[in-house]
Curated annotation (Swiss-Prot):
Modulates RecA activity. The gene is recX. This is Regulatory protein RecX. Keywords: Cytoplasm. Coiled coil: none annotated. Pfam families: RecX_HTH2, RecX_HTH3. Signal peptide: none annotated. One of its GO terms (cellular component) is cytoplasm.
Length: 269
């Protein structure tokens, strides 16, 4: 049977000196000191010591976890990673900490997902697929994600958010791109932000975009100058016109407009 010979308060922990035991000193948190009534001259067996140290791992883990979640909401996976990074290595103790915090609603992956999704909807910046990928990296399960997205981010809301993004893109690029280029850009941008092709198309159609013929021709002649300069170096005659026509068509210009522009175009020497 061993004995506690001294207790010294340090910055964060208590140093406890022991006699007649395998350990000469141990470091405990205040919660452990109180839980086991640790006092000088208290007798402690090796079995008692194992129980004290096991509880202290849990107590320190809980203290660290509470500190970590005090700044903002965290997922269970984030707390688990944080504890491992801070030398709480007993997986059973970690799971016990997570269980206690979850039971007290201090960790709630469903609430975390709800707040995250609602925030993204409010910002109008992300579709469901992008949101899902971000939340998966936070350690939230697929089941929780699918359920929460279905509850909060209906197709109607998705279309509303996508429409606002599409409208903004239209104002930004409307005079710099042809109608086809603009439509392609809007669809691609919306899909990159996590909206389905179906939702992206509905949002685009809702804009009811129309071509500005004068702007389309200005863009065509500007692009024609660049393409003609490139192909005049190696081609001439019919072959040159074919190469230029194909290049401009790939950029979204109409064949009739291209033919009209080429008919009166003076090629560089």
């Amino acid at each position: 049977m061993g004995k506690i010979t001294a207790i010294k308060k340090l910055k964060r922990l208590y140093r406890v000196d022991l006699s007649d035991l395998d350990e000469e000193k141990i470091y405990l948190c205040e919660d452990t000191i109180i839980h086991f009534f640790i006092t000088i001259d208290k007798e402690v067996s090796e079995t008692d010591l194992e129980e004290i140290l096991a509880y202290d791992q849990f107590a320190q883990g809980k203290s660290l976890a509470l500190y970590y979640i005090s700044f903002k909401m965290r997922t269970g996976a984030e707390v688990r990673k944080y504890l491992l990074e801070h030398d709480i290595n007993d997986t059973d103790q970690i799971e016990q900490v997570l269980s206690v915090l979850t039971e007290n609603n201090l960790i709630n992956d469903k609430s975390y997902a709800e707040n995250f999704i609602e925030g993204k909807i409010s910002m109008g910046s992300s579709g469901p697929y992008q949101i899902k990928q971000k939340l998966l990296t936070k350690g939230i399960s697929n089941d929780v994600l699918s359920e929460t997205l279905n509850e909060i981010y209906s197709e109607e809301k998705q279309i509303d958010v996508a429409y606002k993004l599409a409208s903004k893109l239209s104002r930004t690029y409307g005079t710099r791109l042809t109608l086809k280029q603009l439509k392609d850009k809007i669809i691609q941008n919306l899909m990159n932000k996590g909206f389905s092709y179906s939702v992206s198309s509905i949002a685009l159609d809702s804009l009811e975009l129309e071509a500005d013929e004068e702007n389309e021709m200005d863009l065509l002649y500007s692009e024609l100058d660049k393409v003609a300069k490139r192909y005049t170096k190696n081609y001439e005659g019919y072959e040159r016109k074919q190469k230029i026509t194909q290049a401009l068509a790939r950029k979204g210009f109409l064949y009739d407009d291209i033919s009209s522009a080429l008919r009166d175009y003076t090629f560089p020497e």
